[in-house]
Amino acid sequence: MGILLILLAILAFFLLWGVAVYNGLITSRNGYRNAFAQIDVQLQRRFDLIPNLVETVKGYMAHERETLEAVVAARSAAQSGLAAAKAHPGDPEAMAQLAAAQGQLNAGLGRLLAVAEAYPDLKASQNMMQLTEELASTENKVAFARQAFNDAVMAFNNKRDVFPSSLIAGTFDFAPAVQLAIPGDRAEMREAPKVQF
């Protein structure tokens, strides 16, 4: 009878341990999904600003139609990438699609703003100044949200990969999550601004 109680106690311990690890993995997965929702909010804000930016510069840059169309197309592709990533945050394919689309959009916006520099009246426009300020602020919020997401993904993956949690993760198919790295962002951050007199 005593051995049976000891075996039941050991079984109960491992069962409770398994439930605790499983719940921890679920909590961690929900954490990175919530962090992705914050990226979604900021990217939607960015997408909402782009049509206003395009409308503002359209009158000044009539012969730069190709640049404007590239930004609009990149915005559309980025929205599609966001929809795929929103459905499966942390999924390698969805994150790669979103990263590529955001990289394209960053490049298009960079070209648009570079071309806008050639139009002094446009640069001095109050509407353009306000839009570029809002866009820069939103870009900072996207970067912050992306960092929070990547931190949450790393915490989930660490929890998922360490022994003995990896036993529960493998049993219940907790796939590793993938961080979001947008092409071009890191290079721009490493490169110091050039000052010339």
Residue ranges of predicted features:
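A helix-centric hydrophobic-segment signal that preferentially recognizes long
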Residues: 1-197
